[in-house]
């Protein structure tokens, strides 16, 4: 990743690892090449500053949300705050980097002095005529693209490299031309070749969309056979591809790059056409600016020693204003918006278990309404007790109409899947699906969450069913509802109090440990005073 955190400032350029960003709060993107966007994705949720073309591309191809993208016009100066109270500001000016569509250099001016960040750039003399640079400003720190910073590498200008490509194509008038490119860059070279040879240049849909955005000449097409010049991905240029292309039509391939690449086929031609400044161009650029220090952007390629004779005296480390320091440290103490949203979501009460259809109580409900509701419940419990005392078997059929369509044969009622039991209560009309023993349900009386464990005991009442054994919800297990159960039968006083309190009659009241012959006797015994 070719990016940097600028010390003693909240500025980060081409740096997208928030975990390692430290106190960086202002993030800038110089251009859209992949080695400068590592870590940048659709999940990015911080303000991002870039050129208008890069703003379009970063949303179109990386799906960065528009709400976080801040497009800054090239050639203009923009004032940005450096704290949360507006006391400290900085000025940032974007200048064309002559590297690829949308690429820019950033000139930062503030309490830290003047910092020029070139990003990837190809030097031209016109850069020194930029209004932001020609006023003789002292550059305190120069972040320099040092990709080709090696005296042993001699590179031609792009005009000279383009001329070499034209001459090579002229030597192969009957050949198709495959030009290997990266996903972004050298579109102007393709336009130049199309106009020179009066032919269409065949592009991929993605690159065609880009050249239309740039407003280049109408010399590009998607039709494979419309022209003899084809722009392809540089990874497609290989030995096997050359064999395949030459089987159908004579073809040569051109790789316009300054990188050292092994030629795997005699028809692959490498032309040193580079979008990075040569060593001699870097020397000219640094000598004209005379910065106080040079910081290489490509850390694996040191270059400081090459410019010692072009540097101005270094300045002391700038003091960070208190308001800026607080701004840089604020996010380390303050939770992010996403964290707060998650916290709020977790704190929001969620409906779980059984939901009852009833009118919602409002905060201003009168005490008279509460008393009326309480009296109604007491009358309901009394009616249930009277019905149970007069017609126990009839009451059994009312409580379990699905199970009593025919005479009970002593086996446990179950669904077709043998996994779930449906329990109906009277006089309420809803059904409760008893789930596995590690789930929770809501208490019928309090609405609180109550665990359904091995003993079906409501919270706050441990006397009713504590001695009755296990009531398994999954009938495929060794359930007390089967004849193999060793659990003791329910005691009448215990169950009667529980039934009146919770309006719930468990199935094992009628089935646990009862034979078909002794069922009526057990019912009569239960209702004796």
Swiss-Prot record:
Post-translational modification: Ubiquitinated, leading to its degradation. Interaction with TERF2 protects it from ubiquitination.
Listed Basic and acidic residues bias regions: 367-388
BP term (GO), one: double-strand break repair via nonhomologous end joining
Cross-link (Glycyl lysine isopeptide (Lys-Gly) (interchain with G-Cter in SUMO2)): 334
Domain of life: Eukaryota
Described function: 5'-3' exonuclease that plays a central role in telomere maintenance and protection during S-phase. Participates in the protection of telomeres against non-homologous end-joining (NHEJ)-mediated repair, thereby ensuring that telomeres do not fuse.
InterPro entries for this protein: DRMBL, Metallo-B-lactamas, RibonucZ/Hydroxyglut_hydro
Sequence motif: TBM, positions: 494-509
Assembly, per entry: Interacts with TERF2; the interaction is direct. Interacts with MUS81, MRE11 and FANCD2. Interacts with HSPA2, HSPA8 and HSPA14. Interacts with SPAG5.
Biological source species: Ailuropoda melanoleuca
Record keyword Ubl conjugation present: yes
Compositionally skewed regions (Polar residues) per UniProt: 357-366, 468-482
Taxon lineage: Eukaryota, Metazoa, Chordata, Craniata, Vertebrata
Family: Belongs to the DNA repair metallo-beta-lactamase (DRMBL) family.
This protein's name: 5' exonuclease Apollo
GO cellular component annotations of the record: centrosome; chromosome, telomeric region; cytoplasm; nucleus
UniProt keyword list: Chromosome, Cytoplasm, Cytoskeleton, DNA damage, DNA repair, Exonuclease, Hydrolase, Isopeptide bond, Nuclease, Nucleus, Telomere, Ubl conjugation
Signal sequence bounds: none
Any single Pfam family the record assigns to this protein: DRMBL
Reaction equation(s) it catalyzes: a beta-lactam + H2O = a substituted beta-amino acid
Intracellular or extracellular location(s): Chromosome, Telomere; Nucleus; Cytoplasm, Cytoskeleton, Microtubule organizing center, Centrosome
Gene Ontology MF annotations: 5'-3' DNA exonuclease activity; 5'-3' exonuclease activity; beta-lactamase activity; damaged DNA binding
């Amino acid at each position: 990743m070719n990016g940097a955190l600028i010390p003693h400032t909240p500025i980060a350029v081409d740096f997208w690892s928030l975990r390692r960003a430290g106190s960086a709060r202002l993030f800038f993107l110089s251009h859209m090449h992949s080695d400068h966007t590592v870590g940048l994705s659709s999940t990015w949720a911080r303000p991002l500053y870039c050129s208008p073309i890069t703003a379009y591309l970063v949303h179109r191809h990386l799906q960065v949300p528009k709400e976080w993208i801040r497009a800054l016009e090239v050639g203009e100066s923009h004032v940005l705050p450096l704290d949360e109270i507006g006391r400290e500001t900085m000025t940032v000016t974007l200048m064309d980097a002559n590297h690829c569509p949308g690429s820019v250099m950033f000139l930062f001016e503030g309490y830290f002095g003047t910092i020029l960040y070139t990003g990837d750039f190809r030097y031209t003399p016109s850069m020194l005529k930029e209004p932001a640079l020609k006023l003789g400003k002292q550059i305190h720190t120069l972040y320099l693209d040092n990709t080709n910073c090696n005296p042993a590498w001699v590179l031609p200008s792009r005009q000279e490299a383009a001329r070499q490509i034209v001459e090579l194509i002229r030597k192969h008038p009957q050949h198709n031309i495959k030009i290997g490119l990266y996903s972004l860059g050298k579109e102007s070279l393709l336009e130049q070749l199309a106009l020179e040879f009066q032919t269409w240049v065949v592009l991929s849909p993605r690159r065609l969309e880009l050249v239309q955005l740039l407003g280049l000449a109408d010399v590009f097409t998607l039709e494979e056979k419309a022209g003899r010049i084809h722009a392809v991905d540089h990874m497609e240029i290989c030995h096997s591809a050359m064999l395949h292309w030459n089987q159908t039509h004579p073809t040569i391939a051109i790789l316009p790059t300054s990188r050292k690449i092994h030629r795997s086929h005699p028809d692959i031609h490498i032309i040193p056409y580079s979008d990075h400044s040569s060593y001699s161009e870097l020397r000219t650029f640094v000598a004209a600016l005379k910065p106080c220090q040079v910081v290489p952007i490509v850390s694996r390629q040191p270059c400081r020693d090459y410019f010692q004779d072009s540097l101005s005296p270094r300045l002391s480390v700038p003091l960070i204003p208190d308001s800026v320091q607080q701004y840089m440290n604020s996010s380390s103490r303050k939770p992010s918006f996403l964290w707060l949203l998650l916290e709020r979501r977790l704190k929001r009460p969620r409906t779980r278990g059984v939901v009852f259809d009833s009118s919602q109580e409002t905060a201003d409900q009168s005490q008279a309404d509460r008393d009326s509701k309480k009296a109604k419940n007491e009358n309901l419990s009394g009616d249930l007790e009277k019905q149970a005392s007069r017609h126990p078997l009839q009451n059994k059929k009312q409580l379990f109409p699905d199970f009593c369509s025919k005479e009970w044969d002593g086996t446990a009622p179950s669904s077709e899947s043998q996994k779930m039991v449906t329990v109906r209560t009277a006089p309420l009309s809803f059904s409760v699906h008893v789930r596995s023993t590690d789930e929770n349900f809501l208490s019928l009386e309090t609405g609180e969450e109550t665990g359904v464990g091995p003993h079906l005991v409501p919270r706050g009442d441990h006397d009713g069913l504590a001695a009755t054994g296990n009531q398994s919800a999954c009938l495929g297990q060794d359930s007390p509802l089967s004849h193999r159960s060793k659990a003791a039968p329910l005691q009448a006083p215990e169950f009667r109090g529980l039934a009146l309190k919770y309006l719930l009659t468990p199935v094992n009241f009628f089935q646990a440990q009862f034979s078909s012959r002794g069922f009526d006797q057990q019912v009569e015994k239960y209702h004796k005073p």
